[in-house]
């Protein structure tokens, strides 16, 4: 699926890979994560693209297991560990760790900009188990819409253009996600 592009950052991935994994966590663990995220206090004023006007809510979890644990987000690190072993991410993506974990949140009227990410892969976990399809709020990645579904993980090449999709004004819930920015093992040196 590689397209010609003069951007060397884009071409270094050149895979245009998008993978979707459902039922990532066991049900009881997915419920615990969903409940933990619903209790958080969010900080507004984060932009998905520097110098762009649209903002959303954001929380940095940490750059490694120790930072995540110290900040009270050990469960976020556990999502990564579970998915990594369950789906053999080291073999499939050559990934064994992350650059950072953070969370984003949106409501109706809060729409991030289309952007690319640093690193080699981006992984987005959707924690809300009560999210309904008609709420919208999926993720647009390189021309493909990935619907928001609780306990789903989306993995894609970081250089692909992507954005959270709008949330319906009939939705009175906070659209939350946990994001893992990853690099290939050989790039971690």
Please identify what each model-predicted range represents.
Residues 5-7:
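Intrinsic-disorder-associated, low-complexity terminal segments enriched in Asp/Asn/His/Tyr and depleted
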Residues 67-189:
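Catalytic core of non-heme Fe(II) oxygenases with the double-stranded beta-helix
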Residues 9-95:
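Non-heme Fe(II)/2-oxoglutarate
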Residues 1-3, 100:
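Short linear motifs centered on Gly/Pro in flexible linkers and helix caps
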Residues 2, 12-14, 188-189:
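Short intrinsically disordered terminal tails
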């Amino acid at each position: 699926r590689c397209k010609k592009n003069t951007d060397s950052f884009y071409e270094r991935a050149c895979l245009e890979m998008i993978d979707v994994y459902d039922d990532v966590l066991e049900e009881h663990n997915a419920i615990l994560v969903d409940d933990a995220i619903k209790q958080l206090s969010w900080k507004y004023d984060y932009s998905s693209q520097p110098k762009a006007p649209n903002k959303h809510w954001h929380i940095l979890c940490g750059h490694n297991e120790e930072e995540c644990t110290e900040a009270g987000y050990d469960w976020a690190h556990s999502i990564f560990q579970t998915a990594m072993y369950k789906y053999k991410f080291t073999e499939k993506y050559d990934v064994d760790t992350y650059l950072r974990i953070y969370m984003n949140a949106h409501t109706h009227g809060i729409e991030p900009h289309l952007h690319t990410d640093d690193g080699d892969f981006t992984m987005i976990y959707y924690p809300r188990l009560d999210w309904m399809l008609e709420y919208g709020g999926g993720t647009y990645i390189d021309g493909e819409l990935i619907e928001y579904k609780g306990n789903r993980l989306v993995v894609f090449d970081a250089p692909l253009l992507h954005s959270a999709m709008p949330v319906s004004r009939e939705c009175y819930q906070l659209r939350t996600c946990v994001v893992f920015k990853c690099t290939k093992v050989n790039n971690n040196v």
